[in-house]
Amino acid sequence: KSHFGNNSVIAIYITSSRYQNEKKPYADKDSFLLSLMELASWDWRNTRILVEHCDAYTKENPNPQKGFLSLSDEINAINQTNDKCGSNIGIVINWGRSVIEHRNVDGPLKHIKHAAQNNVLGGLMFSGTTANNHNLYGAWSDRHMTPATFSDYKYFEPESLMSYQNIKNTLDVCDFSSLDCLGIKLLAMPEESSIEKRIGINRDTMYLLDQAMAELYKA
């Protein structure tokens, strides 16, 4: 704080939790609302609370990776909290988790539009997934797969659904200049990957995001 003042921490990430599927209906929207109300009562200064949406249990996603609350339930709880407490809690859409929930690359676009229409879109997190098992990550897994092969960059996965074009399409449906955060969440595979690779996948993906945003700004 002595160096950055009250802007030291831009946002705090939370999730709605807990796991639910057809047999385990544990996620509770009323408990989540109470938790948000309590969090909103604390003095966060200029730090914003952001709820990262994780894949919810749906008919398309009967065995979810996370299985937390639906986006609609999260948005309703956020809006109730903001209205009652005068807070500014928002939503972060995780690209991979929205793809997993919908089982297609239109999932993130739908979630972004839903959050934006309710004035709670606070950030985007790019984390990949894949539809097949021809890789070390696994089909529809929440293992933070790197983007698909792009240009001459070194660290990419050919089977990833998170292609350059899909990243551009995602950025294009929102005013990303108004977001509190735009991030990446990636995992190097195999588990014994070198430090060089772990750094490289993050570096190359940031280059990719920079290029996508530059092209969109030109347009």
Region spans (language model):
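Short, flexible loop/turn elements at secondary-structure junctions
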Residues: 14-18, 53-55, 95-97, 128, ...
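Histidine-acidic metal/acid-base catalytic patches
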Residues: 35, 86-93, 100-219
